[in-house]
């Protein structure tokens, strides 16, 4: 079975354990496939924003690649944190590395939930931030996420709650 998705890497296409990967190459594991931090296999996600759970893209530059799983696949879902369609495979091909501009443009037309998860985990530069604020200026959910996660406005949700309480009493 083939399944396409995304995999995040440290700069230089290395994983969290220091293993280097190359575009166009296929990698296989030995031993039984198992999802998790102490697992065995190559993790990837169906949606790009879910890869940000595994790499600190708010603090450091990362690379995100399109990948294809070519072997056995194990699926994992974390309903508590709303992470779905995360996978682990015993055989993966690194198809290509996405350019930053591609990543930014991918989320200019996604639903609120996906955009909010993206801005929660991927540090936008000032020009990208201005673009997102322009595109989503009438979308209070996305604008609040931008204010909180990108601009560090830790009171944005409290202000919104106070406004709602005031409106209910009038």
Question: Model regions: which residues?
Answer:
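Short, glycine-biased loop/turn motifs at secondary-structure junctions and
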Residues: 1-170
């Amino acid at each position: 079975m083939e399944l396409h998705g995304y995999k995040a890497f440290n700069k230089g296409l290395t994983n969290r354990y220091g293993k280097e990967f190359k575009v166009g190459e296929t990698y296989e594991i030995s031993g039984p496939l198992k999802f998790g931090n102490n697992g065995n296999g190559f993790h990837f996600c169906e949606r790009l924003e879910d890869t940000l759970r595994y790499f600190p893209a708010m603090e450091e530059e990362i690379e995100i690649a399109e990948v294809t799983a070519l072997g056995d696949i194990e699926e994992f879902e974390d309903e508590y944190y709303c992470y779905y369609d995360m996978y682990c495979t015993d055989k993966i091909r690194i198809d290509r590395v996405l350019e930053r501009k591609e990543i930014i443009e991918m989320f200019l037309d996604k639903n609120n939930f996906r955009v909010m998860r993206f801005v929660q985990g991927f540090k936008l530069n000032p020009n990208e931030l201005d673009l997102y604020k322009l595109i989503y200026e009438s979308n209070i959910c996305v604008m609040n996420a931008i204010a909180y996660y990108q601009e560090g406005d830790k009171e944005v949700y409290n202000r919104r709650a106070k406004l709602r309480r005031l409106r209910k009493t009038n």
